[in-house]
């Protein structure tokens, strides 16, 4: 007897759990790079997020009268939690990641029926809710720890997240008192803030002299471009393993690069297109978030259109909006368009007459 089950169904012999584990593995280079440059807060936020996500998913599935272990074993909720944890500031208060994870799991996934039913990327739902609700906590980034006179230890990181103070009683601001205050933002934040008050090309050289951009005098936006390169390497690995398709990340990056390059010819406005590609969450979003098989387009042409749309939205938000990054908003806005994209890009069924022919 065959047992009939509802969608989503697994194809190509790849179990969902195996795919999720491959994606998590591909994120590890960026994960450890982020720890190297920004400290143990990344590790603690990830542990908090994964623990909260598992508990929330367990309760939600239990309330629906199903067996939680059958769903938790696919590791999808762990991946969602890890993506969210790596997207927020490493030393944000503990309640930020807990609230964000609950929103991601419950409002972004379970409210629609679970894995395969959600129209929006759950991690980005949680991230956007946090960004809108707690802008101060979500935009206060510690500079790379090698710029600090006293980098926080594991105990300091734990204490900062849960009490706001290190074990010696210092706040995050006090730890960075010897560095220009603008370094508590990301390079994209710094560039946008600086540009609003300086619009001359000569002023740009003053911007890149700031510690967050030059550090020891050789690194551009140190920490950030290394993390983006690590995400790029992990993304290429997933493409080679056929876990994700190349169309979405390539279309997204090429679209953004072309628009950013064209803008550069109109006059000095922002960082170069290359600098934009290795700053913020560009590579993270292109290879690990936009490629979510549940919320992205499923047709070959649709993937290209979807990726290009994400790249367009990122460009519009970064260059003409108030948010310096915009990857999360771009992906959610593009998720809205997926049903329409898939409808008009469905491959013609063999033997089915084309439009206008009988």
UniProtKB/Swiss-Prot annotation:
Localisation per UniProt entry: Cell inner membrane
InterPro entries for this protein: NqrB/RnfD, RnfD_bac
FMN phosphoryl threonine carried by residues: 186
Transmembrane segments: 19-39, 41-61, 79-99, 125-145, 220-240, 248-268, 271-291, 297-317, 321-341
Predominant place of localization: membrane
Entry GO CC: plasma membrane
Keywords: Cell inner membrane, Cell membrane, Electron transport, Flavoprotein, FMN, Membrane, Phosphoprotein, Translocase, Transmembrane, Transmembrane helix, Transport
GO BP annotation list: electron transport chain; transmembrane transport
Enzyme Commission no: 7.-.-.-
Membrane topology: Multi-pass membrane protein
Pfam family, one: NQR2_RnfD_RnfE
Enzyme class: translocase
Cofactor: FMN
Lineage: superkingdom: Bacteria
Homology family: Belongs to the NqrB/RnfD family.
UniProt function note: Part of a membrane-bound complex that couples electron transfer with translocation of ions across the membrane.
Subunit structure: The complex is composed of six subunits: RnfA, RnfB, RnfC, RnfD, RnfE and RnfG.
Protein name: Ion-translocating oxidoreductase complex subunit D
Taxonomic lineage from the root: Bacteria, Pseudomonadati, Pseudomonadota, Gammaproteobacteria, Pasteurellales
């Amino acid at each position: 007897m065959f047992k009939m089950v509802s969608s989503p169904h697994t194809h190509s012999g790849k179990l969902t759990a195996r795919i999720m584990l491959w994606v998590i593995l591909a994120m590890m280079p960026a994960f450890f790079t982020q720890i190297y440059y920004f400290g143990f807060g990344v590790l603690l936020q990830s542990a908090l997020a994964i623990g909260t996500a598992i508990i929330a998913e367990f309760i939600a599935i239990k309330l629906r009268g199903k067996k939680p272990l059958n769903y938790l074993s696919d590791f999808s909720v762990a991946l969602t939690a890890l993506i969210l944890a790596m997207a927020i500031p490493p030393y944000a208060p503990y309640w930020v990641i807990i609230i964000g994870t609950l929103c991601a799991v419950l409002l972004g996934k379970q409210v629609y029926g679970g894995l395969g039913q959600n129209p929006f990327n759950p991690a980005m739902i949680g991230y956007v809710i946090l960004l809108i609700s707690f802008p101060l906590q979500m935009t206060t980034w510690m500079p790379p720890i090698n710029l600090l006179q006293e980098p926080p230890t594991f105990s300091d990181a734990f204490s900062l997240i849960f009490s706001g103070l290190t074990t010696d009683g210092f706040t995050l601001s006090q730890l960075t008192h010897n560095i220009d205050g603008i370094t508590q933002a990301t390079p994209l934040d710094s560039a946008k803030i600086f540009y609003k008050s300086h619009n001359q090309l000569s002023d740009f050289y003053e911007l890149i002299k700031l510690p967050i951009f030059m550090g020891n005098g050789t690194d551009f936006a140190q920490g950030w471009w290394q993390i983006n390169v690590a995400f790029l390497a992990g993304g290429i690995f997933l493409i080679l393993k056929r876990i994700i398709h190349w169309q979405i990340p390539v279309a997204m990056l090429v679209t953004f690069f072309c628009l950013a390059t064209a803008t550069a010819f109109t006059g000095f406005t922002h960082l170069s297109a290359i600098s934009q590609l290795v700053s913020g969450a560009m590579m993270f979003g292109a290879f690990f978030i936009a490629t979510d098989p549940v919320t992205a387009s499923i047709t070959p042409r649709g993937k290209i259109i979807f990726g290009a749309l994400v790249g367009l939205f990122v460009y519009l938000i970064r260059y003409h909006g108030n948010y310096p990054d915009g990857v999360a908003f771009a992906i959610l806005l593009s998720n809205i368009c997926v049903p329409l994209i898939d409808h008009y890009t469905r491959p013609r069924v063999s033997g089915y007459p084309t439009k206008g022919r009988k």
